[in-house]
C-alpha cells in the first residue's frame, strides 16, 4: 500500500533478517524512498507488530489514518513523526471482516461486512443497524467470503456489497446501505469488482465474463 504521505506499507510480512512471514507485522519504507526498508537514524523506515488477532486481513486509507483489520480487531495507524514515525491504536476488538475487499470508504467513513453484521468507522467503530441482516447472513456462502467486494456509490450516498449466496460459487447478490437515509436494499447481480465514478461519468463494475459495465447510466 502507498500512503498519501509517500510511505510504502507491507502488511503481514517478514521482519528484517528473517525469511519467515509474520502475519501480524507491518513494515514501511522510508518516506519518499520506496527502496529503503532498513531503519536508521537518518530515515523513517520502520515496523510495528499488532497484538490483537492472528493475521492482518486488509487495510484502507482515510484522510488521516490507515484503518487496519485483523481477523478479530481494528487498528488505526497514524503518522507520529520521528522517532516512532507511525503508531497504532486499537479502535475495535472482537470485530470481524469477511475478506480483503469487504471494506469501502464513502464520504470519509469506512464501512465493512463482518461475519454476522455490518460496521462503520467514523473516528469510532460502530455496528450498523441492518434490517436485512438475517436475509444476508442466513443465505451467504461462508466458504466464498474472499469474493465479497465492497464499493462506494457516493453520487447516491450508497455502499454496495457483492457476495455469493449459500448455493453459489460466484457473487450473485448485492446488498446496499444508503448512509444518508439509513436504509438498506438488495438485489441479484454478479460483480467481481467495483470503481466509483470519481473522475468517470459513472461507477463501473466488473463481471465474471471479463466485461466492464456502466452503472447509473441512462440511455436516451
Show which residues each predicted segment covers.
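A short, charged helix-loop
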Residues: 32-48
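A broad "ordered helical/assembly scaffold" signature
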Residues: 26, 37, 56-57
Amino acid at each position: 500500500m502507498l500512503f498519501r504521505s509517500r510511505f510504502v506499507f507491507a502488511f503481514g510480512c517478514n521482519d528484517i533478517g528473517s525469511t519467515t512471514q509474520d502475519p501480524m507485522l507491518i513494515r514501511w519504507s522510508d518516506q519518499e524512498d520506496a527502496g529503503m526498508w532498513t531503519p536508521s537514524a537518518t530515515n523513517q523506515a520502520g515496523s510495528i507488530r499488532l497484538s490483537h488477532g492472528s493475521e492482518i486481513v486488509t487495510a484502507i486509507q482515510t484522510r488521516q489514518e490507515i484503518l487496519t483489520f485483523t481477523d478479530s480487531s481494528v487498528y488505526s495507524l497514524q503518522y507520529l513523526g520521528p522517532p516512532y514515525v507511525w503508531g497504532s491504536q486499537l479502535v475495535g476488538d472482537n470485530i470481524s471482516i469477511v475478506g480483503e475487499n469487504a471494506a469501502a470508504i464513502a464520504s470519509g467513513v469506512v464501512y465493512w461486512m463482518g461475519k454476522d453484521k455490518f460496521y462503520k468507522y467514523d473516528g469510532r467503530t460502530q455496528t450498523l443497524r441492518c434490517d436485512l441482516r438475517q436475509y444476508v447472513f442466513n443465505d451467504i456462502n461462508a466458504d466464498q467470503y474472499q469474493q465479497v467486494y465492497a464499493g462506494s456509490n457516493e453520487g447516491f450516498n450508497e455502499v454496495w456489497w457483492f457476495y455469493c449466496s449459500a448455493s453459489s460459487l460466484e457473487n450473485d447478490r448485492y446488498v446496499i446501505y444508503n448512509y444518508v437515509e439509513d436504509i438498506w436494499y438488495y438485489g441479484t447481480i454478479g460483480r467481481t469488482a467495483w470503481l466509483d465514478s470519481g473522475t468517470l461519468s459513472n461507477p463501473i463494475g466488473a463481471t465474471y465474463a471479463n466485461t466492464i459495465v456502466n452503472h447509473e447510466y441512462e440511455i436516451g
